[in-house]
Structure formats: structure tokens, C-alpha cells
Amino acid sequence: MRPSTSVRTICANCSNHTRLFSTTVRSRSQQKSDATPASPPQAGYARLTNRGLISITGVDSTTFLQGLITQNMLITNDQNRATRQTGSYTAFLNSQGRVLNDAFLYPLPQADLTSPDEPAWLIEVDRNEVASLMKHLKKHKLRAKLKLRALEDGERTVWASWKDHEQPRWAAYNLESPSSSPFSPSSSIAGCIDTRAPGFGSRIITPGAEDLRTHVPDETQIAGSEVSLGAYTVRRMLHGIAEGQSEIIRESALPLECNMDMMKGIDFRKGCYVGQELTIRTHHTGVVRKRILPVQLYTGDQDALESAGAPVYDPTAELPLPPSAANMYKISARRARSTGKFLGGVGNIGLALCRLEMMTDVTLTGERTQYSPEQEFKVSWDAAEEGSSEHQEPGEVKVKAFVPSWTRDFILNGGVKKNTRGREAEGHRAREFLEQLEEEESLRQKE
């Protein structure tokens, strides 16, 4: 029987008791993480100041986005190909199929529409990437009838809200529901269920910079009180969710390795969009050998850590955080082959892109796995180069990857493939897609 992989934290009272494993590094010369946030509550909401918004309006805005994002802008079961009215998780890719930006897309609330016949959308993205995404959108705009604008600070606010005591679920309503959000169409609030992990909560966009309860006082919709961005980040990492281009590396990360297929961020049934070819080919014919997973950073005994079954966040931990993209290796390995890359962390937890058959017990093929429960892994790094803006000192910590139960089930059950057609039908569909892509590429070369 597999151990539970539910997310776990250590409260302030429990942290005074004996720890299962050491998380304290005694060397003061090592670079330590910033003050770690408190453990996230079971219910609460956070102001996401690290996220920015772009508005896109105009008669061509829907078809324009349809050719750029991994999500489908049209309701696929509607004979008239009606426009989607729900917010959703999605991504922008480059022509090689690498992620440019992870994003959320929301239809602008009806109360804010200048014309009911003119579609309008809000794109939520990493705040540091707003300028880059605007440049990408303008490059593809050409003669499309639409307007792009980066929203000013305080114009609208992005929130994350959750209630962990409720029954975990992937979504509270169908992505193709006629309802755009859980809020009244007459309000100026946009939102959607966050489908990146079961029961992860909701995404909400409110006008202005006031507290969320100013706009949504109903306790049945919003529970708990406001917490820090750091507490939200801890909760997100415990669920194994990467966000923003400090973790989903721009023009390097692949959408399937970032679990976007599992997070309902990709519609494999839609037509052509930038970066589709590699994504479709990998989905239908390839094996995803690396995925982003939650990891535990530690310096103590592996046996005690193994019994936890899931990452345990300790707000009192004092560990040096490895730099982003630092390589992970087996301890005492004869050949120093990288087993993955560390992406980011808070305190004694983090996220890493892991080779599944090396760092976990997940078996992807019938071949013999390289994983051993006794094997430990480490991430080590050198000091930052002289003249660098960062002041990173050399360091090393052990790292343990965990596979959330929903991630394991998705992988072992064949993911979305299992939910659509049989293997033979999938192979036929894959060939059709590839033939279509090759034909379109041939036509483009003749033009």
C-alpha cells in the first residue's frame, strides 16, 4: 500500500518538538533563504502581487488567442463553435514547443464590456514577464482587429482562494460550462477554478486594490482570512505546482514536463497553434520521462524522511536554498549523471524537474528502473561568479522527490489518453495530426 501523498506542514507549536530529520545547517558562511513564511492555513486567500494582467479586446481577439495558446478558445461540443465563456489555465509556446509563459485566461466580466458583440479577455501572467509577453503578442498581431494593454498597478488585483477542508476535486464546474465564473454576470469580478491540482482552490480578479472581502463578503465563497504571498507559495509548492518563469524556465521548459497536460492547460483536440507540433507528437507517441515534483530539502537521516510519505514544511528550518537550475545527482554515484534540476524553494521544501525512473518508484516502460529506495540525492552549487548581482555562496543539501497521488494516478493510468480512445485509435489520430502539420508546413513553404 502506497503512503499518503497529501501535503503536510509543521505548525509553530510542533516545531518546538524533536524533528524527524535535521534541517539546520550550522555553517554561518552559507547563503540562507529569506525569512520563511508561516504554514498556510486550511482556508484563506492571498493577494498575488507577483502576477500581472494584460487586456486584449476586439473582434479578432478570440481567434488571435486561439492560434497562440495551448487551451481551446472554442467550445468543442458546440456545432456553431461558440466562444468559451470560462476562465482557464493555459500557456504560450514558441515555435519549438518550449514554454514562453504559463498563464491564466479570463473572459472580461460582462459588466465591463464596451460592446456585447466585441469579445474581451484578461491574461494573467508572471509580473516580470508582462513586457516580454506584450512583445510576443504584438509580433503576431499583424492586421488583427484588436487592442492590447498592460494593466496598471492597482487597476485590478489577482487573488488565490482555497478551502482545504472541502472535498478535493479537479473543478467545480465543467470547463465548457456556459457560466464564465462562480460570480454574477453583472459583477466586475472575473475568476475560475484553479485546475492545476485537485482542491487547489480558485483564481479571482477584482477591480481596484481593495481587500477581497470588499467584493466577495459571502463566507460560502471566500473562507478564512488574508495570508501572505509566501504562505500561498508554500502551499503551491507542497502541491507540486510551478508558476512563473523563475520556475518554468522561458524557452527551455516543455509543457508536458511542467505537468500542463495533467493540469488541464492543454487541449489536444484543438487545431493549429504556435508550438503545437512537438506537444502533439510527444503526447501521442512519446514518453514524458521528466516531470516537476515537490521535493524536500534536508541534511539528516533518510529513514526518518522516508516515513513522512510527503514533503513536510517546517517554517523554522534554516537551509541554504540552491540556485535555480542547479543540477541534482545521486550521492556516491560512480558516474555523475544529472538526475534533474532544482527550480526553486522556500525553507526546506521546493520544486524540481526530476527524472522519474531515477528519483521515484514510477515505472514508465517495461524496462528495469534505476530507482532504489535506499538511494539518496543531493544538489550542490558553486559560489556566484565575481561581479554577479547574486551573492550565492557554495553549498550542498540533500533532496528527496515525492510524487503526489494525483500525479501518480495520472501517469500510471495513461493520463488523458486513457480518457479518450483506445491505443489503436490514438495512433491513428496521431498520424492524422502529423500529416496535417506536414501538409500545412509544405503549403507555407510554397507561399
Swiss-Prot record:
Q: GO CC: one term?
A: mitochondrial matrix
Alphabetical keyword list:
Mitochondrion, Transit peptide
Ranges of Basic and acidic residues compositional bias?
A: 421-434
Q: Name one Pfam family in it.
A: Beta-barrel_CAF17_C
Q: Which residues form a coiled coil?
A: none
- Cellular location(s): Mitochondrion matrix
Ranges annotated as biased composition (Polar residues): 24-36
Q: Which InterPro entries match?
A: TrmE/GcvT_dom1, YgfZ/GcvT, YgfZ/GcvT_CS
| GO biological-process terms attached to the record | iron-sulfur cluster assembly
Source domain of life is Eukaryota
NCBIfam families (alphabetical): ygfZ_signature (TIGR03317)
Name of the molecule in the record: Iron-sulfur cluster assembly factor IBA57 homolog, mitochondrial
What is the organism of origin for this protein?
Aspergillus oryzae (strain ATCC 42149 / RIB 40)
Gene responsible for this protein: caf17
